[in-house]
Curated annotation (Swiss-Prot):
InterPro entries: Na/H_antiporter_dom_sf, NhaA. This is Na(+)/H(+) antiporter NhaA 2. It is found in: Cell inner membrane. It comes from Sorangium cellulosum (strain So ce56). The chain crosses the membrane at residues 31-51, 82-102, 118-138, 147-167, 176-196, 199-219, 226-246, 321-341, 353-373, 393-413, 422-442.
Length: 468
């Protein structure tokens, strides 16, 4: 056994087996480091769900996601189906990662300047208003009129995955703009659901949310660093939002925005703490101490390593792979299976409903986002992020037309069950697919890979840019 093999393999390793494992898993590891890999996995999961839901085995698809799952402690039990725990439980972690990224950008990124933070707010408002107006123009009368909220929503998971397929053509600031826009859009959609599509709102639930948020702030004041304790406070917030009739995944956004952005030790503190830990380790190791006594300096070194980074950065790095390759594909598999067998476009009002949703997503979203961004910049209220040109905003507008699961959810509230719901689902599917394809085509035409590194020299240059 060579020296390099001794260094690269734990004691007791059978080297032929280790080489075989490396030969098998290295291509997978290289794939996972490709920027668009998460988007590819997401699209594969979507295709599987669609094929499964429209196959002879469609009943097994429905049966799987309606499997009851019971969680609880002692006599307090909550039983919901698997679909609920994925959409309202696991997706909270996705929203937490999104909240972390937004928090980091607000602190030291492109959103740290108020003038630039205004842009995603304006984009989200325009991206909600124009689709609703287009839909209402085509469907002015009830009962189809009640579906005006369907094309307003942007599906963050699918939109981010689709944008990832463009790889290094997408500047980091453009992705942040989409994330911020989609978060605000999603909050807007939830407010629409709460105000126009909800039967009742529980004030008690919001009281529980306030208690949870106060708990998080108190824990930070006491210097508590354990993620488990904060997760417990997050469960309280989640339960409060669920009880209040608000989508509980907003818990993730709230916790992400509350996450500290300053490290405990920092760079200099880490070096000093690590130096002390290594000196202690060397003293104990050379002094013939029992191996168990080495755990102290190693724990000290581990704490220094952990606290050298801000919690917002550390948590984002730890959770991102799980979200990108686990939660998001599972979410797609559970939600993308739209059965099209019962859709009849010949029924009264069906064609207008279909066109209202499709045009709202494919035309209303990019048009509303472009108009709102242009007005806010021209009026001096906002500025384009550094490195983002108007052509990039156009791509974001197209990607934002991927409504999918949130749009389907709103459709269920607007139309209940029956023919109109089937048409609305088909329209959401078509509109989202067209938006994704148009975004890919436009992105490959107008965004060049080199642009990822071409940053506007100044904020004024980015703001004044009219180049597409």
């Amino acid at each position: 056994m060579g020296t390099s093999d001794l260094r690269n393999a734990p004691p007791g390793t059978w080297l032929p087996a280790r080489r075989l494992a490396r030969w098998i898993f290295q291509p997978l590891e290289r794939f996972l480091h490709v920027q668009a890999a998460s988007g590819i996995v997401l699209l594969i999961a979507t295709a599987v769900a669609l094929a499964w839901a429209n196959s002879p085995w469609a009943a097994s698809y429905e049966r799987l996601w309606h499997t009851p799952v019971r969680l609880g402690v002692g006599s307090y039990l909550v039983e919901r189906d698997l679909h609920f725990w994925i959409n309202d439980g696991l997706m909270t972690i996705f929203f937490f990662v999104v909240g972390l990224e937004i928090r980091r950008e607000i602190h030291q990124g492109e959103l740290s300047v108020l003038k630039r933070a205004v842009l995603p707010v304006a984009a989200a408002l325009g991206g909600m208003l124009f689709p609703a107006l287009i839909y209402l123009a085509l469907n002015p009368s009830p009962p189809e009129r009640s579906g005006w909220g369907v094309p307003m929503a942007t599906d963050i998971a699918f939109a981010v995955g689709a944008l990832a397929l463009l790889g290094n053509r997408v500047p980091a600031a453009l992705r942040v703009l989409l994330l911020a826009l989609a978060i605000i859009d999603d909050i807007g959609a939830i407010l629409v659901i709460a105000v126009f599509y909800s039967s009742s709102i529980s004030v008690t639930g919001f009281g529980l949310v306030a208690v949870g948020i106060a708990g998080v702030l108190a824990l930070q004041r006491f210097g508590v660093r354990s993620p488990v304790v904060y997760a417990a406070a997050g469960v309280v917030i989640w339960a409060g939002l669920l009880s209040a009739g608000v989508h509980p995944t907003i818990t993730g956004v709230l916790l992400g925005l509350l996450t500290p952005v300053h490290p405990w030790f920092g760079e200099e503190g880490f070096l000093a703490e690590a130096r002390r830990a290594l000196e202690d380790f060397q003293e104990r190791a050379t002094g013939g101490h029992d191996a168990r006594e080495l755990t102290g300096p190693l724990a000290q070194l581990s704490q220094a390593r952990r606290e050298a980074l801000p919690p917002v950065v550390r948590l984002e790095a730890a959770l991102h792979p799980w979200v990108a390759y686990g939660i998001m594909p599972l979410f797609a598999l559970a939600n993308a299976g739209v059965s099209l067998g019962d859709v009849h476009l010949g029924a009264a009002g069906s064609t207008r409903l279909l066109l209202g949703v499709v045009f709202g997503l494919t035309m209303g979203k990019p048009l509303g986002i472009m108009v709102a961004c242009s007005l806010s910049v021209k009026l001096g209220l906002a500025a384009l992020p550094r490195g983002v040109l108007w052509r990039g905003v156009l791509v974001v507008g197209c990607v934002a037309g991927i409504g999918f699961t949130m749009a389907i959810f709103v459709a269920g509230l607007a139309f209940g069950a029956g023919q109109r719901l089937g048409v609305a689902k088909l329209a959401v599917l078509l509109g989202s697919l067209i938006s994704a394809l148009v975004a890919m085509a436009v992105g490959r035409l107008v965004l060049r890979p080199a642009e990822a590194g071409q940053i506007a020299a100044t904020a004024d240059e980015a703001e004044a840019s009219t180049e597409y």
